[in-house]
């Protein structure tokens, strides 16, 4: 499933084409994805100017001039691609559209761009676990999808002091706590594994032990907060990780998977200088966890 860096990469890829463009027409080729489309979906967005493209956790947010927000979640295999007018080439690296996947093109946005010309933005989703919703912008933060979301792991908002307060008293394993979207929004399996390795903390450790009993920051919470921010920033800069179904909006692949230190490296030597450990895998919360039992404590 695409995680926060992948969704942010898609947002940045779509932004130059979609922001400021007007939606001339929407081809909705089926009645549902994971959930049914909102009633009158195509008509509600037709003719609207896209004011801004945002992101909250793993959700893409298209802010429309009519006061509504088109919320899109990529699910397991959802992706967007861009086709410029007069060409079937994808913008950017000139990857041609993959004809075998066209049967999974479920939504096509026909756009008039603000600087002139036109484009099509196509949503493709073989497994159909993604979805699209239309919400009034005033109701966005109160909607069940967003009301309980925690702090974003980007920028400086997530520091050691805040992380200590969030995890104080939590008896869950540290990895499970970090993936609780009510605490930190947008973190997923891959990047939690990587951040824990960088911070030298075991995914099995009780979450509360990175803080004092009073919920104050410690060296552990400071290291972990810094590792989370750095891993997310580096993954965004690398265009995310191309595992299975994920591609960027221009059709190209992400490259952060080439920087993995623990994820999907079971049985390989730990990359930390001076560590003699071997990366191990175990199932935690129904997901594969990768870590070094020597340097992660």
Curated annotation (Swiss-Prot):
Molecular function per GO: 8-oxo-7,8-dihydroguanine DNA N-glycosylase activity; class I DNA-(apurinic or apyrimidinic site) endonuclease activity; damaged DNA binding; zinc ion binding
GO process annotations (BP): base-excision repair
Enzyme Commission number(s) of this protein: 3.2.2.23, 4.2.99.18
Names of required cofactors: Zn(2+)
Gene3D superfamilies named in the record: 1.10.8.50, MutM-like, N-terminal (3.20.190.10)
Pfam (any one): Fapy_DNA_glyco
SUPFAM superfamilies: Glucocorticoid receptor-like (DNA-binding domain), N-terminal domain of MutM-like DNA repair proteins, S13-like H2TH domain
Sites where the protein binds DNA: 104, 127, 170
UniProt catalytic activity: Hydrolysis of DNA containing ring-opened 7-methylguanine residues, releasing 2,6-diamino-4-hydroxy-5-(N-methyl)formamidopyrimidine; 2'-deoxyribonucleotide-(2'-deoxyribose 5'-phosphate)-2'-deoxyribonucleotide-DNA = a 3'-end 2'-deoxyribonucleotide-(2,3-dehydro-2,3-deoxyribose 5'-phosphate)-DNA + a 5'-end 5'-phospho-2'-deoxyribonucleoside-DNA + H(+)
Comment on bound cofactor: Binds 1 zinc ion per subunit.
Active site as annotated: 2-3, 58, 287
Keyword Transferase: no
UniProt keyword annotations, A-Z: DNA damage, DNA repair, DNA-binding, Glycosidase, Hydrolase, Lyase, Metal-binding, Multifunctional enzyme, Zinc, Zinc-finger
Zinc finger residue ranges, FPG-type: 261-297
Subunit structure comment from the entry: Monomer.
Family: Belongs to the FPG family.
Function as written in the Swiss-Prot or TrEMBL entry: Involved in base excision repair of DNA damaged by oxidation or by mutagenic agents. Acts as a DNA glycosylase that recognizes and removes damaged bases. Has a preference for oxidized purines, such as 7,8-dihydro-8-oxoguanine (8-oxoG). Has AP (apurinic/apyrimidinic) lyase activity and introduces nicks in the DNA strand. Cleaves the DNA backbone by beta-delta elimination to generate a single-strand break at the site of the removed base with both 3'- and 5'-phosphates.
Name of this protein: Formamidopyrimidine-DNA glycosylase
Source organism of the structure: Chelativorans sp. (strain BNC1)
């Amino acid at each position: 499933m695409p995680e926060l860096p992948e969704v942010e990469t898609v947002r940045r890829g779509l932004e130059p084409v979609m922001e400021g463009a007007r939606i001339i027409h929407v081809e909705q080729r089926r009645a549902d994805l994971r959930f049914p489309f909102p009633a009158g979906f195509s008509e509600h967005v037709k003719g609207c100017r896209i004011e801004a493209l945002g992101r909250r956790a793993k959700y893409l947010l298209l802010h429309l001039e009519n006061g509504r927000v088109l919320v899109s979640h990529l699910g397991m295999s959802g992706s967007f691609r861009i086709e410029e007018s007069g060409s079937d080439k994808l913008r950017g690296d000139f990857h041609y559209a993959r004809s075998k996947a066209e049967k999974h093109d479920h939504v096509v946005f026909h756009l008039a761009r603000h600087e002139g010309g036109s484009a099509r933005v196509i949503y493709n989703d073989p497994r159909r676990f993604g979805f699209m919703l239309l919400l009034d912008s005033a109701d966005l933060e109160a909607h069940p999808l967003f009301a309980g979301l925690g702090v974003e792991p980007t920028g400086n908002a997530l520091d050691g002091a805040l992380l200590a307060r969030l995890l104080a008293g939590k008896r869950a394993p540290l990895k499970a706590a970090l993936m609780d979207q009510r605490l930190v929004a947008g973190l997923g399996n891959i990047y939690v594994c990587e951040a824990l390795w960088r911070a030298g903390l075991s995914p099995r450790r009780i979450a509360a032990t990175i803080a004092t009993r009073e919920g104050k920051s410690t060296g552990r919470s400071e290291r972990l907060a810094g590792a989370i921010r750095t891993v997310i920033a580096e993954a965004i800069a690398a265009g995310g990780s191309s595992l299975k179904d994920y591609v960027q909006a221009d059709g190209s692949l992400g490259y952060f998977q080439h920087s993995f230190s623990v994820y999907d490296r079971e049985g390989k030597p730990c990359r930390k200088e001076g560590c003699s450990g071997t990366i191990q895998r175990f199932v935690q919360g129904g997901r594969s966890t990768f870590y070094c039992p020597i340097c992660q404590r």
